[in-house]
């Protein structure tokens, strides 16, 4: 089914405007037959944040912003789905065009601006599917015009706690003015304190829903020191490393398109994000697991991210170029690598290369 979907959809979608193609892909997924997801190899199972994942490959926030197709994505073989970013009020985001393919670089630039249907609509969708199981996380953010952004996060934690498998506190999107300022030490400490307090208030009805923090790859190492210290002191359950980057390398082939404003994702982000995973892993000292994101487009890339320190990984941009078949390909490669090297579980290799990657001679 997945091969057929890719064979039919990829050539067509590449002819369309990127945002129109994305909309069509979501609609297509919703129409697929409700077949059971493929069984995962036992050695791919991961326990993290108090949750049991059948495999480590998730889909990152931004693909299914409005929780329209989480079950279809789980049937495609993802071990977990992260919907959003969701804001309390619906918002249209930034003006179009706001999504750009850099095809020769297998990259994407976006300046979407948290366009979404708003908390109430998305909550109804998740509530309607909550009995179906599967790990579905909720990525939460603040409205662009909010007068109290911390209150936006708190409200969403309280709203979605009964239906979210986990929360991701997104303070790292570059496309909402001022949002990344919430990564600064004092602001982040205040935000996480209030988010954790909100989680505790609804624990009686929702349980101990894990709270993760998603950071930018553009932090300096001194800034990362502060972020990880605060995350540990506030006892967050994990971190997602990393969001899109504002940086542009001279090696990009599509230099004209690279001048578009917004966050860059895809293959050019791989080394920067992997370095950030390793740096975060070393600083966390086992306090919490990491989800590695950024430029993963093969089993080898997934393995590198895991050996850098990621217990789980997420995909998005590579799916535009390689299709949903990439999910099974990565899982097969990871399972085969474990068998070939005599390892029983992925947890045995998490962070194995972090010291090497954080060394000065590992280029970004």
UniProtKB/Swiss-Prot annotation:
<feature type="binding site">
    <location>
        <position position="266"/>
    </location>
    <ligand>
        <name>FMN</name>
    </ligand>
</feature>
<feature type="binding site">
    <location>
        <position position="175"/>
    </location>
    <ligand>
        <name>substrate</name>
    </ligand>
</feature>
<keyword id="KW-1003">Cell membrane</keyword>
<keyword id="KW-0665">Pyrimidine biosynthesis</keyword>
<dbReference type="GO" id="GO:0106430">
    <property type="term" value="F:dihydroorotate dehydrogenase (quinone) activity"/>
</dbReference>
<dbReference type="GO" id="GO:0044205">
    <property type="term" value="P:'de novo' UMP biosynthetic process"/>
</dbReference>
<comment type="function">
    <text>Catalyzes the conversion of dihydroorotate to orotate with quinone as electron acceptor.</text>
</comment>
<feature type="binding site">
    <location>
        <begin position="316"/>
        <end position="317"/>
    </location>
    <ligand>
        <name>FMN</name>
    </ligand>
</feature>
<keyword id="KW-0288">FMN</keyword>
<feature type="binding site">
    <location>
        <begin position="110"/>
        <end position="114"/>
    </location>
    <ligand>
        <name>substrate</name>
    </ligand>
</feature>
<comment type="subunit">
    <text>Monomer.</text>
</comment>
<dbReference type="InterPro" id="IPR005720">
    <property type="entry name" value="Dihydroorotate_DH_cat"/>
</dbReference>
<keyword id="KW-0560">Oxidoreductase</keyword>
<feature type="binding site">
    <location>
        <position position="85"/>
    </location>
    <ligand>
        <name>FMN</name>
    </ligand>
</feature>
<feature type="binding site">
    <location>
        <position position="214"/>
    </location>
    <ligand>
        <name>FMN</name>
    </ligand>
</feature>
<comment type="similarity">
    <text>Belongs to the dihydroorotate dehydrogenase family. Type 2 subfamily.</text>
</comment>
<protein>
    <recommendedName>
        <fullName>Dihydroorotate dehydrogenase (quinone)</fullName>
        <ecNumber>1.3.5.2</ecNumber>
    </recommendedName>
</protein>
<feature type="binding site">
    <location>
        <position position="139"/>
    </location>
    <ligand>
        <name>FMN</name>
    </ligand>
</feature>
<dbReference type="InterPro" id="IPR005719">
    <property type="entry name" value="Dihydroorotate_DH_2"/>
</dbReference>
<keyword id="KW-0472">Membrane</keyword>
<feature type="binding site">
    <location>
        <position position="295"/>
    </location>
    <ligand>
        <name>FMN</name>
    </ligand>
</feature>
<feature type="binding site">
    <location>
        <begin position="243"/>
        <end position="244"/>
    </location>
    <ligand>
        <name>substrate</name>
    </ligand>
</feature>
<keyword id="KW-0285">Flavoprotein</keyword>
<feature type="binding site">
    <location>
        <begin position="61"/>
        <end position="65"/>
    </location>
    <ligand>
        <name>FMN</name>
    </ligand>
</feature>
<dbReference type="InterPro" id="IPR013785">
    <property type="entry name" value="Aldolase_TIM"/>
</dbReference>
<feature type="binding site">
    <location>
        <position position="65"/>
    </location>
    <ligand>
        <name>substrate</name>
    </ligand>
</feature>
<dbReference type="GO" id="GO:0005886">
    <property type="term" value="C:plasma membrane"/>
</dbReference>
<feature type="binding site">
    <location>
        <position position="170"/>
    </location>
    <ligand>
        <name>FMN</name>
    </ligand>
</feature>
<comment type="pathway">
    <text>Pyrimidine metabolism; UMP biosynthesis via de novo pathway; orotate from (S)-dihydroorotate (quinone route): step 1/1.</text>
</comment>
<feature type="active site" description="Nucleophile">
    <location>
        <position position="173"/>
    </location>
</feature>
<dbReference type="GO" id="GO:0006207">
    <property type="term" value="P:'de novo' pyrimidine nucleobase biosynthetic process"/>
</dbReference>
<feature type="binding site">
    <location>
        <position position="242"/>
    </location>
    <ligand>
        <name>FMN</name>
    </ligand>
</feature>
<dbReference type="InterPro" id="IPR050074">
    <property type="entry name" value="DHO_dehydrogenase"/>
</dbReference>
<feature type="binding site">
    <location>
        <position position="170"/>
    </location>
    <ligand>
        <name>substrate</name>
    </ligand>
</feature>
<dbReference type="GO" id="GO:0005737">
    <property type="term" value="C:cytoplasm"/>
</dbReference>
<dbReference type="Pfam" id="PF01180">
    <property type="entry name" value="DHO_dh"/>
</dbReference>
<dbReference type="InterPro" id="IPR001295">
    <property type="entry name" value="Dihydroorotate_DH_CS"/>
</dbReference>
């Amino acid at each position: 089914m997945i091969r057929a979907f890719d064979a039919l959809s990829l050539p067509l979608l590449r002819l369309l405007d990127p945002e129109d193609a994305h909309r069509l892909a979501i609609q297509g997924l919703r129409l697929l037959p409700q077949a059971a997801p493929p069984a995962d190899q036992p050695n791919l199972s991961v326990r993290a944040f108090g949750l049991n994942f059948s495999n480590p490959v998730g889909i990152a926030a931004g693909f299914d912003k409005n929780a329209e197709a989480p079950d279809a994505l789980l049937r495609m073989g993802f071990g977990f789905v992260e919907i959003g970013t969701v804001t309390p009020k619906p918002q249209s985001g930034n003006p179009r065009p706001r999504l750009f393919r850099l095809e020769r670089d297998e990259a994407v630039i976006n300046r979407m601006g948290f366009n979404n249907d708003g908390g109430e609509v998305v909550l109804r969708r998740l509530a309607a599917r909550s009995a179906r199981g599967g790990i579905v996380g909720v990525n939460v953010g603040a409205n662009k015009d909010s007068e109290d952004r911390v209150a936006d996060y708190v409200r969403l934690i309280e709203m979605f706690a009964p239906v979210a498998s986990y929360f991701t506190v997104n303070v790292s999107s570059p496309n909402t003015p001022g949002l990344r300022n919430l990564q600064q030490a004092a602001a982040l400490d205040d935000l996480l304190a209030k988010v954790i307090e909100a989680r505790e208030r609804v624990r009686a009805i929702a349980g101990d829903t894990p709270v993760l923090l998603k950071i930018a790859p553009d932090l300096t190492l001194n800034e990362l020191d502060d972020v990880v210290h605060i995350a540990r002191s506030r006892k967050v359950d994990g971190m997602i490393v990393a969001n899109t980057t504002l940086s542009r390398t001279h090696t990009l082939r599509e230099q004209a398109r690279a001048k578009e404003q917004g966050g860059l994702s895809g293959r050019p982000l791989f080394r920067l994000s992997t370095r950030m995973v390793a740096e975060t892993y070393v600083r966390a000292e086992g306090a919490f697991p990491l989800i590695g994101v950024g430029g993963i487009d093969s089993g080898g890339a997934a393995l590198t991210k895991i050996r850098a320190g990621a217990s789980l990984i997420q995909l998005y941009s590579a799916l535009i170029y390689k299709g949903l078949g990439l999910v099974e390909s990565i899982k097969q490669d990871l399972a085969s690598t474990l068998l070939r090297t005599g390892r029983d579980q992925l947890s045995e290799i998490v962070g194995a290369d972090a010291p090497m990657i954080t060394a000065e001679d590992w280029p970004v």
